[in-house]
Amino acid sequence: KYDERILHEVTLESIKDYRETGAIPASFEKAGPKESIFFEPAKTKVAIVTCGGICPGLNNVIRALVNQLVYRYGITRILGIRYGYEGLIPKYNHPVIELTAPMVSDIYQSGGTILGTSRGNQDVEQMVNTLEILNINVLFCIGGDGTLRGAHAIYKEIEKRKLRIAVAGIPKTIDNDIDLMQKSFGFETAFSIANDI
């Protein structure tokens, strides 16, 4: 069911507040396979971008994402956006790379991100223009709080234009400072190394 949600805060007090005010509680769409999917896999084109600072596990996430898209959903057109959101801005001239299961098979052995990364705000309209030019149906944004704010801005521009592009955020930060999350990948490793020092 698409209307199943997981509540972020489940306390009697918060439930009472939501009922009294009529507010919609903070929640997540329930993860897992659905009865039907919006995009037809054979025609779907996906892009993956990594932004912000590097942290342990980035290449593992890229690899797992590509493998799931290919082997579970049968999606074979997957692009890697180079150097963060800069890769969606034409003036930087960062070429996209084709991501395949064989290409990402051993990237977990390397640190950082094979896609490169960058920091800083980019022009949202230009980024969405690039997604349209590339015929992207789904954009996965891997990053911290700034990246996720950027992903939300991209989503709002897509919504404004009434485009059929999905945007998904994959939280990553060694700071563990993303709302509604107990732990993000990268934090555990950073904490354990800092603890050893």
Predicted regions located by residue number:
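Short Gly/Thr/Asp-enriched flexible loops that form oxyanion-binding sites at enzyme active sites
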Residues: 61-65, 146-165
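Short, ordered loop/turn segments at secondary-structure junctions
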Residues: 51-53, 80-86, 119-120, 144-147, ...
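Glycine-rich oxoanion-binding loops at beta->alpha junctions
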Residues: 2-39, 86-139, 174, 183-196
